[in-house]
Each structure stands twice: as C-alpha cells, then as structure tokens.
C-alpha cells in the first residue's frame, strides 16, 4: 500500500511541475480542432470531440475532414496528441521507478 501511495504522490508531483506544458498542449489541440471545425463547418462540440479523438489516436472515423488544409491540421493534432501521451507515460514511468528505488522493491 505504501508503494502505491508513493507512486501516486510522485506522479501528481511531477504532473504539477509539467502542468503548464500539458495545459498548453491541451489548449493547442482544442484550438486547432476548432480551426478545423470552422473550415469544415462543424459545430463547436463536434470539432472538440473530433480533435481529442484524433489527438488520442482513437480515430473512430465517424467524423473526418475533407479539405486539404483540415487534413494537414489533423496531422499536427495527431502529433501533439502523441507528444501529450508520451509525456504522461514518461511521468508514470518516472514515478514508478522512484517508488521502486525508495522502497527497495526489486
């Protein structure tokens, strides 16, 4: 139980340090999604939904851009989503590694 709390404590500590970067990435994804929505004439919710489905690389395919500029922006949104996911995974690994070393589990 102490191990789990140590991992969570370290995870949220690192998240708090990287919050400006994570917030910037999320706002950039949302903003680019709204831009694509404007180009494609989608409503705001549909554009937001599509941008995060694309950024998280889920890609249901129920909504897709048809214009060339929208497709280009969707590539950028996808890359930003991969960066965001990579940062979260790196933070999780760092927190777990710290907890393993601190508790002496091997």
How does the language model describe each region?
Residues 1-16:
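Membrane-helix boundary elements
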Residues 9, 101-106:
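Membrane interface segments of multi-pass transport proteins and intramembrane proteases
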Residues 12-19, 67-73:
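Membrane-interface helix-boundary signature
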Residues 15-32, 81, 85-96:
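Hydrophobic alpha-helical transmembrane segments of integral membrane proteins
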Residues 15-16, 28, 35, 56-59, ...:
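General secondary-structure edge motif
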Residues 19-50, 65-68:
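Outer-pore turret/helix-boundary of cation channels
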